[in-house]
Each structure stands twice: as structure tokens, then as C-alpha cells.
């Protein structure tokens, strides 16, 4: 029984190419719809895509036609209503055919919006388009688990799917020439002798018959040699080479002190969920370190970071000190691209804010690729914000700070912080 194996890239989804072309064409409409969806839905609600609506006027194909207005002379075959010289009244413009709410119209026509669904993968692709971790430059072989397959010559053994047909046939041809060389030489001599006998001694049937038998014997010997032997088989040799990979670590520092209201904590968690989703989708080799802090800081796992209800006073420097210790112990700056994202409401013990600036400027900023700080407050900024502004003046390319007032600000601020930079 024969089996047909479908190895096409699209498989059964024959319209995949057309769908991708459609998504590229209406990219701006889809991006706008995705941004609106992110602002109104929960960041954790990513199990499905989004329903996209495109106005009917935007999906019309451009066509060449006569413009409205002007004078035209047209012959209508079989016209019984009008005669030459009469004026045909101009058709009225459309009025009541649009899709939407409003009063009914008695004339005109319109077109409903085109609505379609994008998948979860497509939703995330548009959501994180043009975003990246800045300054991801350090690449090392240490601990690399990524490899690339490269050609490494020809081998005598290997997988049948990697057989080199040209080299195999060349080897078989060389073997046949080498093993049949003497027989072919004798065959040529016998053929010459037969030709001579047929011309000079045509009646010498005995010698002619003997030479013919010798020729047949030599041909049989040559033909017994197999056209292809296992010795001839040659295979493309492929080897895996370690591929230098960018190792990165992201420190997530979240304030869970008593001054953070439940609404403020929810905004902070949504920001970090969006960041975590972005990292895990776009980067294969990246580690995330979660740090919660109030008067003291602790490294926690993902579950505790997002769902623990522990709270207390506010000493922001405790989180920065812990981050510096973890960097020194596990993530040397010579091998790792180090990033950090900090979220707080800005409330801090007054004497602690200068300490935070000192730790950042001397122990952290010289070793990180990028540090972001988001302050979640509708009020005026406090001392911590102004201390961090001084950090931004000293490190304008690797430090950024933004303010969040409501949940609707999360996605725009996130895009602002991680917008892809043009190479300089």
C-alpha cells in the first residue's frame, strides 16, 4: 500500500499564505484594535485572540472608473424610456445604508464592517511588535545549549536521507574503472583481432569463433561487476557547533508595603505580568529573578511574587541591596546582560531615598544594560522619584522612569520603555 505524506509547510491550512498577506495589509487596523483590547481586558486573559473590525470602506479594492459629474454621451442598447437629447436625472447619493445605529433611510446603500478573529499567537505578535530588550550584546559560549548544524565534509556511513548522490556515483564510476581496467584492455585487443580476422581471413571460422567467445567472456566479466556497491556510498557529514547565545537576566522588584493600596498593587502586578509574558515569548535564554520588598526584601518564586499577601513598611534600598548581592553571586556582568524593572508607589522612608540613589549609581547601574522604574501614583512625586531623576541624568541611555496613574496606562508605558531603538 502506498502512503502520501503531506510535507507542505502549511499542511491542511491552505489559506495560511493568504491570511498572512491579509494581516500584513491591514496591520495598522489590527494594531489599533490590539492596543484597545489590551487596555480594556485583563493582562492575564490571553487564552484567546481578539475580534477585529475593519470598516467596509477600507477593504475596497482600488478601481479605475469614470468620475462623477461632467457631461457624458452614452448609448444604451434597447433603451425605450429616453431618446437622444433628453437629460437623465442624476442618481441620489447614499444615505441610509451604513452599518450602525441611527434612523432608517429610504435610499442609498452601504456596507457593514468586515469582522474576523485573530488567534492568540497573532494577538501576542501584534502586542509585542517592535519591542525588545535594549543593549542585548554580550554573547558567550559558557553554558550554551544552542547549536547550529554545519557541513563537515563526506563520510562513508550515515543516514540514507543524507546520501550525496553525485559523490556516490563518482565513487562507483571510479571503482568500476579500476576493477575492470585490465578486462577492458583485453576486450579492446580481442575486438581488434576479430576485426582483422574478418578482413584478412574471413574463411578462418575456427579462430573467429574463438575470438568471439573470448569477447563474450570478457563482456560477461565486466557486467558481473555491480553498478553500485556499499563501498561507493557517500554521505554528507553534518556536525553540531555550539552557537554563541545571549544570556540575560531580568530582576523584577515590586513594592508590597502598606502604602501600596490594593488597586496600586494590582496595577504593579499587571505590569509585571505583561513584562513576564513579553520575556518568555520573545527570548529563549532568559532568567527572571523576583524580589518583593517592604521593610525587608526577599527573593521569591513566580507564584509568591504575584499572589502573596505579605506587607509591611517601606525601605526600598533593601530590594536594591538584595539585587546587588544576587548579581555578584550568580550573574557576573562580564557574562550576563542584566536588566531590572522596579515598580513602587514612590512612598519611601525619607532617609532611605538618598541611599537608593547611591546604591544604584555606584553598584548597579555600571553593570546593567537597562533599568526601568515605574511609579504608580496619581499624586505628586516624592523624594524617591527626584533621586531617580538624578540617576537618569547620569545614565540617560540605560535608565528610564515613567508614571502610571491607571490600568489603562500600563500598555502605552510598557511600549515606551521597551520600544526598539534604532542602531546608532
Swiss-Prot record:
Compositional bias segments (type: Gly residues): 92-107
Entry superkingdom: Bacteria
One Pfam family matching this protein: DUF444
Region (Disordered) location: 81-107
UniProt xrefs under InterPro entries: UPF0229 (IPR006698), vWFA_dom_sf (IPR036465)
Family membership noted in the UniProt record: Belongs to the UPF0229 family.
Name assigned to this protein: UPF0229 protein PputGB1_0427
The organism's taxonomic lineage, starting at the top: Bacteria, Pseudomonadati, Pseudomonadota, Gammaproteobacteria, Pseudomonadales
Amino acid at each position: 500500500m502506498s502512503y502520501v505524506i503531506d510535507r507542505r509547510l502549511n499542511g491542511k491550512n491552505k489559506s495560511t499564505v493568504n491570511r498572512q498577506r491579509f494581516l500584513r495589509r491591514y496591520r495598522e487596523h489590527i494594531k489599533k484594535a490590539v492596543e484597545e483590547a489590551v487596555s480594556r481586558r485583563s493582562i492575564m486573559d490571553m487564552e484567546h485572540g481578539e475580534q477585529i473590525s475593519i470598516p467596509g470602506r477600507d477593504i475596497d479594492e482600488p478601481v479605475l472608473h469614470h468620475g462623477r459629474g461632467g457631461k457624458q454621451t452614452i448609448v444604451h442598447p434597447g433603451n425605450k424610456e429616453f431618446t437622444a437629447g433628453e437629460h437623465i436625472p442624476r442618481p441620489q447619493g447614499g444615505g441610509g445604508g451604513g452599518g450602525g445605529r441611527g434612523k432608517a433611510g429610504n435610499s442609498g446603500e452601504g456596507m457593514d464592517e468586515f469582522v474576523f478573529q485573530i488567534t492568540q499567537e497573532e494577538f501576542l505578535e501584534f502586542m509585542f511588535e517592535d519591542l525588545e530588550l535594549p543593549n542585548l550584546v554580550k554573547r558567550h559560549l559558557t553554558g550554551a545549549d544552542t547549536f547550529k548544524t554545519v557541513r563537515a565534509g563526506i563520510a562513508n556511513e550515515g543516514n540514507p536521507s543524507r546520501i550525496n548522490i553525485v559523490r556516490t556515483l563518482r565513487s562507483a564510476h571510479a571503482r568500476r574503472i579500476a576493477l575492470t581496467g585490465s578486462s577492458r584492455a583485453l576486450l579492446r585487443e580481442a575486438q581488434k583481432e576479430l576485426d582483422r580476422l574478418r578482413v584478412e581471413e574471413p574463411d578462418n571460422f575456427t579462430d573467429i569463433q574463438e575470438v568471439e567467445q573470448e569477447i563474450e567472456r570478457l563482456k560477461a566479466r565486466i557486467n558481473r561487476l555491480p553498478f553500485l556497491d556499499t563501498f561507493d556510498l557517500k554521505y554528507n557529514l553534518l556536525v553540531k557547533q555550539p552557537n554563541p547565545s545571549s544570556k540575560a537576566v531580568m530582576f523584577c522588584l515590586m513594592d508590597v508595603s502598606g502604602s501600596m493600596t490594593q488597586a496600586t498593587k494590582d496595577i504593579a502586578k499587571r505590569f509585571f505580568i505583561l513584562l513576564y509574558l513579553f520575556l518568555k515569548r520573545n527570548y529563549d535564554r532568559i532568567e527572571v529573578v523576583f524580589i518583593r520588598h517592604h521593610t525587608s526584601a526577599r527573593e521569591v518564586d513566580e507564584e509568591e511574587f504575584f499572589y502573596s499577601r505579605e506587607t509591611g513598611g517601606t525601605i526600598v534600598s533593601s530590594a536594591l541591596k538584595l539585587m546587588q548581592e544576587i548579581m555578584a553571586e550568580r550573574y557576573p556582568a562580564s557574562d550576563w546582560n542584566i536588566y531590572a524593572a522596579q515598580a513602587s508607589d514612590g512612598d519611601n522612608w525619607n532617609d532611605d531615598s538618598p541611599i537608593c540613589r547611591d546604591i544604584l549609581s555606584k553598584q548597579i547601574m555600571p553593570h546593567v544594560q537597562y533599568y526601568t522604574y515605574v511609579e504608580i501614583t496619581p499624586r505628586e512625586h516624592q523624594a524617591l522619584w527626584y533621586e531617580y531623576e538624578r540617576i537618569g541624568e547620569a545614565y540617560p541611555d540605560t535608565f528610564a522612569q515613567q508614571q502610571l496613574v491607571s490600568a489603562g496606562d500600563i500598555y502605552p508605558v510598557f511600549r515606551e520603555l521597551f520600544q526598539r531603538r534604532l542602531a546608532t
